[in-house]
Amino acid sequence: MGQKINPLGFRLGTTQGHHSLWFSQPKNYSEGLQEDQKIRDCIKNYVQKNMRTSSGVEGIARIEIKKRIDLIQVIIFMGFPKLLIESRPRGIEELQTTLQKEFNCVNRKLNIAVTRIAKPYGNPNILAEFIAGQLKNRVSFRKAMKKAIELTEQADTKGIQIQIAGRIDGKEIARVEWIREGRVPLQTIRAKIDYCSYTVRTIYGVLGIKIWIFLDQE
């Protein structure tokens, strides 16, 4: 059986960049890592609570964290930043104060910026949220997959593969279903591939969604 490595880690340094940029002493490294995870979770929870969207898509593509001695710079890449800004005009300031309270940044300044990504449905995280929303609303998984592929075609991608695993459509026996459109060269290191795995809780149990999107060849 072919073993699948995580496509993002496999391409680190060639087509993929790091989402956290900072240095620390080896003894403080684990603290910094946990802090990053907490910041990401805190932002996702805040967005979930304060954004009421019809499609159920929060639209966070990724969160980049850059740290200096006196500053934590957080950049949120979103597909639909309007939703956050319109639903809460002072949303970003609120989020900033919430994070500062959480991490009691006394000697460090916290700065949050929101950046819009050009083609939201060319991003696997946003697409996975879309599919998860469809599955929660009991739409058939094949319909959800086909709709997702239609959305990526508008975003000029070279290829996409979607895999859903678990008790699909509430069947007693769990199975894995997948669909591929276009090319997805996972073995080519210079191929720019974006990937995400997403867990969705339905009334029948947990489903796992994996999405590979082939964007471009370097």
Swiss-Prot record:
Key words, A-Z: Chloroplast, Plastid, Ribonucleoprotein, Ribosomal protein, RNA-binding, rRNA-binding
Broad class of where this protein is predominantly found: plastid
GO CC annotation terms, alphabetical: chloroplast; cytosolic small ribosomal subunit
Domain annotation KH type-2: ranges: 47-118
InterPro entries: KH_dom-like_a/b (IPR015946), KH_dom_type_2 (IPR004044), KH_sf_prok-type (IPR009019), Ribosomal_S3_C_sf (IPR036419), Ribosomal_uS3_bac-typ (IPR005704), Ribosomal_uS3_C (IPR001351), Ribosomal_uS3_CS (IPR018280)
Disulfide-bond pairs as recorded: none
Protein location: Plastid, Chloroplast
Any Gene Ontology biological process: translation
Signal peptide stretch: none
Domain of life: Eukaryota
Pfam families from the UniProt entry: Ribosomal_S3_C
Record carries keyword Chloroplast: yes
Keyword Nucleus included in the entry's annotation: no
Example of a GO MF term: structural constituent of ribosome
Family under the similarity heading: Belongs to the universal ribosomal protein uS3 family.
Assembly, per entry: Part of the 30S ribosomal subunit.
Family annotation (HAMAP family): Ribosomal_uS3_B (MF_01309_B)
Protein name per the record: Small ribosomal subunit protein uS3c
